[in-house]
């Protein structure tokens, strides 16, 4: 708001101008609305699909909230999540288990006022845009958008094992895991922000079943000293052998806007700062063996 006095004559004039009072009356009492939606679909023993949605418009608030406490943004989000057992597509005798999980979530927040000119509502700024490109650019700056996706296969395995005495080469000893997480964000100060994480792992675990070697068990002497000796034995194989190999990769990329030049109007809406990024790759390996060599049988 600007107040002033203009002299339309050619003569120079002097005077005093007093502004005694500036008052705002009648708050903008327009209300808003909100809605939630949920959907759950069960696909027999194959899995399930869940969908949720939520929307909150500007001006929404609780009954006890004042005008200043009400939201000034339009916010919308939806999410779809599915969990499936892909092993159901294989014959039962194959004993295949492939638990699959996938989800996608999208959020969008649109402010009421133009972030480049907070005295103007966003819809008025879009209407005043001179071209479609300028309109799209203003909308991309004003709105904050977040997209997240998750995909994973956890402990996929083929449960075929040798009966009674599991062998080290049985397919049931192996399991495989893979996951990918992705997030992409755009907003007022961020042209885009990207986060990615990949993980792959292979696990092996073998627990042999065997009878311990007890060389003195057959002694029939009733001496208590020999009785103690009879309870000793030797486990000639470990109780469990396991190893794990895991590879992870993380990637991060951030492209920020040059807000100083953007707010001053000395550059276009596509002005940006230097790109920031980071990347990490890890390969972790773990081996474990559980072996109680000596066996002692407690008296019954």
Regions found by a protein language model. Name each.
Residues 33-37, 76-82, 147-153, 198-204, ...:
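Hydrophobic, lipid-facing positions within transmembrane beta-strands of outer-membrane proteins
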Residues 55-77:
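Outer-membrane beta-barrel translocator/channel fold
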Residues 11-14, 61-68, 109-121, 128, ...:
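Outer-membrane beta-barrel translocator domains and adjoining extracellular loop/strand segments
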Residues 45-46, 84-101, 110-115, 154-174, ...:
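Short loop/turn motifs that connect adjacent beta-strands in outer-membrane beta-barrel proteins
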Residues 7, 26, 55-59, 102-110, ...:
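Transmembrane beta-strands of outer-membrane beta-barrel pores
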Residues 296-300:
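Conserved small/polar residues in nucleotide/adenosyl-binding loops
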Residues 1-12:
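Extracellular beta-strand ligand-recognition surfaces/modules
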């Amino acid at each position: 708001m600007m107040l002033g006095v203009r002299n339309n004559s050619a003569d120079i004039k002097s005077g005093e101008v007093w502004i005694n009072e500036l008052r705002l009356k009648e708050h903008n009492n327009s209300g808003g609305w909100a809605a939630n939606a949920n959907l759950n679909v069960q696909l027999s023993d194959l899995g399930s699909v869940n969908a949720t949605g939520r929307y909150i418009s500007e001006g929404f608030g609780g009954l006890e909230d004042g005008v200043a406490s009400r939201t000034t943004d339009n916010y919308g989000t939806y999410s779809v999540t599915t969990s499936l057992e892909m092993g159901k597509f294989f014959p039962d005798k194959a004993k295949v288990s492939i638990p699959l999980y996938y989800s996608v979530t999208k959020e969008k927040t649109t402010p009421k006022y133009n972030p480049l000119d907070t005295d103007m509502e966003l819809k008025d700024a879009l209407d005043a845009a001179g071209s479609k490109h300028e309109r799209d650019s203003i909308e991309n700056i004003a709105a904050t958008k977040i997209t997240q996706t998750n995909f994973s296969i956890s402990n996929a395995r083929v449960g075929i094992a040798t009966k009674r005495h599991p062998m080290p080469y049985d397919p049931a000893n192996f399991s495989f895991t893979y996951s990918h997480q992705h997030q992409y964000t755009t907003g007022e100060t961020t042209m885009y922000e990207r986060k990615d994480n990949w993980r792959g792992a292979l696990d092996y675990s073998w627990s042999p079943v065997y009878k311990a070697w007890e060389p003195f068990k057959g002694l029939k002497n009733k001496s208590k000293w020999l009785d103690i000796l009879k309870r000793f034995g030797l486990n000639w194989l470990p109780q469990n052998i396991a190893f794990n190999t895991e590879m992870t990769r993380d990637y991060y990329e951030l492209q920020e806007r040059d807000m100083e030049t953007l707010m001053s109007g000395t550059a276009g809406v596509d002005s940006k700062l230097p790109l920031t990024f980071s990347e990490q790759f890890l390969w972790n390996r773990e081996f474990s063996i559980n072996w109680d060599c000596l066996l002692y049988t407690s008296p019954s």
